[in-house]
Amino acid sequence: MIKESDWNERYHRPRRRRRRRGCLTRLVTTVLVLGLLVGWLWWQQNGLSSETITVSSAPDGFNGYRIAVVSDLHAKEFGEGNQVLLDYVRDLEPDLVAVVGDILHEPDQMSMIPAVAKGLAAIAPTYYVTGNHEWAAGVVRELEPLLEQCGVTVLSNEYVMLERNGDRIALLGAEDSNGYADQKTVQELADQVRQEQGEVYEILLSHRNNHYEQYAQARVDLTLAGHAHGGLIRLPGTDGLVGPKRELFPQYTAGLYDLSYGQMVVSRGLGNQFPCFRLLNRPDVPLVVLG
């Protein structure tokens, strides 16, 4: 005869085992989900991305000309010496690299400049303009000569002429508006190009996306900009959640835009001044292909 205590033990033991297995399953599932979430969030902050943007208004001689736009690095390092970033840019096979400001934001970050500057210059001719943070950090006078020593061409309210297959493009570079009060304006720079070179296709490197009206008024054909960080959190159907001035739902934060005159390509950027959270907005190196 089975004692009642033995019967209860035999009856309840499988139930306890099932409960333990259920708790273990829930624990493992929770750990896996959290691990995947952490990994995905890390990838959102550090996984490089690129969009190929075709601009069809350039001269025929520049068909297929490739420009990699590097913006808002903010001294962020993708691998030691930014080697991951350099390898990524190299794989894009650019004919030109445009660095459109905010490469750093603190004076003590100057030590990271040589590695990334020399690396980019070794990939393709590299041109640089300042952003607001280089001026705010008070490093422009030291930074620009250092970049030149590393093989990068600094365009300080200046322009250079590019030639390819018998056609010409003027590449203009505007200092950020945080610069000197009496510095040349975009309009004045564009007027200088037309006086000296006649009517040519113009590409402007300028940090601030929100100065798009100035670029259109100056009748620049194509502007390459950054500054907006893609709106940080890119909600579906929006141009991002937060703008550079902490405004909600900013405009012109990523991709190609038709202005009242000309076009503008805006990079979502690579880093941030503060530990900001990116969502659906991975670090960005857009590739502009002239068609």
What is the meaning of each model-derived region?
Residues 25-42:
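Hydrophobic membrane-insertion alpha-helices, especially the h-region
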Residues 1-22, 123:
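N-terminal Lys/Arg-rich, disordered targeting/topogenic segments
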